[in-house]
C-alpha cells in the first residue's frame, strides 16, 4: 500500500522542521509578556457584577458567624443526654435574629427555628416532624448524631481565608459569598472602552437590519455580534463601529 502523499497546497502545511505552537504554550507566552493597561478602582460589592478583581479578596469574618439551626425543631445537648432520652421542653424559643438568652440544661430542649443562633448548651437539633410532643416533653426516638441539623461556625468561609482570587470575574453568586464573608468593597480593574468593527466589502450587516437579503458574493457579518456579546458578558463598555470597507482611505 502506497503512503498517502501530502498536499503541496495544504493551507495548514508548514515548512519542514517548523511546527505550530500549541495553544497552552501560546497562552503562557501571552500571560508572561503582557501587562495590564488599565487602572484599578475600589467599588461596593453590590455594584461588582461582571467586574474583574485586581486584588484577591479575603474573608473579614466567619460565615456563618455563629452556630445555627438548619431546620425548625428542638435543640438539646446530645453529648449530655441521659439514657432515658426524655427531654423536657423549656418555654420560649430561639428564632433568627431573636436568640434565646439562657443556657439549656441537661435533658432539656428548646424550640428553635431555621437560622436561629444555637443557645448555650445546644449541640444538636431534631426536626419537629420527628418528635411527638406530650404536654411539655418528648421522647427522642431517632438515633441522631451529635451536631445533626446544625451549621457550625465558619462552615462556608473562615475569617482571613481566600474567598476569590486575582482576575476572578464576579458573578451574582460571588456577591452573596463576599457579603456573607464581611467583604463589602473590592478592588477591580477599571472598565475598558472597546470599539468593535468588521472589515470586508463582502460583509452584510444584520444588526438593526433583520431579514436583509444577500447579493451574490456576500455573506452575513456573523463575527461582530459574537465579539460584541463576549465583551458585554465581561462587563466592558462596548462601541459598535459597524463594518469598514476594503478601502484604506475610508478606513
Question: Whereabouts are the PLM-identified features?
Answer:
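Catalytic cores of alpha/beta
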Residues: 251
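Short, glycine/charged-enriched hinge/interface segments at domain edges or termini
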Residues: 2-18, 74-240
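Short beta->alpha junction loops
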Residues: 240-248
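Short, low-complexity N-terminal leaders and the immediately following helix N-cap/first helix
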Residues: 1-83
Amino acid at each position: 500500500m502506497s503512503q498517502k502523499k501530502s498536499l503541496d497546497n495544504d493551507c495548514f502545511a508548514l515548512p519542514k522542521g517548523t511546527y505550530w505552537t500549541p495553544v497552552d504554550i501560546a497562552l503562557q507566552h501571552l500571560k508572561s509578556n503582557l501587562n495590564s493597561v488599565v487602572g484599578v478602582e475600589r467599588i461596593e460589592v453590590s455594584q461588582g457584577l461582571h467586574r474583574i478583581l485586581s486584588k484577591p479578596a479575603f474573608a473579614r469574618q466567619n460565615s456563618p458567624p455563629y452556630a445555627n439551626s438548619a431546620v425548625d425543631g428542638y435543640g438539646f445537648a446530645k453529648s449530655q443526654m441521659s439514657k432515658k432520652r426524655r427531654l423536657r421542653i423549656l418555654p420560649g424559643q430561639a428564632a433568627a435574629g431573636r436568640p434565646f438568652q439562657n443556657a439549656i440544661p441537661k435533658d432539656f430542649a428548646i424550640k428553635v427555628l431555621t437560622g436561629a443562633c444555637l443557645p448555650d448548651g445546644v449541640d444538636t437539633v431534631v426536626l419537629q416532624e420527628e418528635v411527638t410532643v406530650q404536654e411539655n416533653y418528648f421522647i427522642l426516638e431517632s438515633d441522631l448524631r451529635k451536631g445533626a441539623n446544625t451549621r457550625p461556625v465558619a462552615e462556608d468561609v473562615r475569617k482571613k481565608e481566600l474567598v476569590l482570587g486575582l482576575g476572578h470575574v464576579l458573578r451574582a453568586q460571588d456577591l452573596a459569598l463576599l457579603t456573607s464573608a464581611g467583604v463589602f468593597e473590592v478592588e477591580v480593574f477599571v472598565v475598558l472602552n472597546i470599539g468593535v468593527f468588521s472589515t470586508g466589502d463582502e460583509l452584510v450587516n444584520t444588526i438593526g437590519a433583520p431579514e436583509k437579503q444577500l447579493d451574490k458574493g456576500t455573506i452575513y457579518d456573523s463575527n461582530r455580534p459574537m465579539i460584541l456579546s463576549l465583551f458585554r458578558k465581561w462587563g466592558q463598555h462596548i462601541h459598535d463601529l459597524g463594518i469598514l470597507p476594503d478601502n484604506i482611505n475610508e478606513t
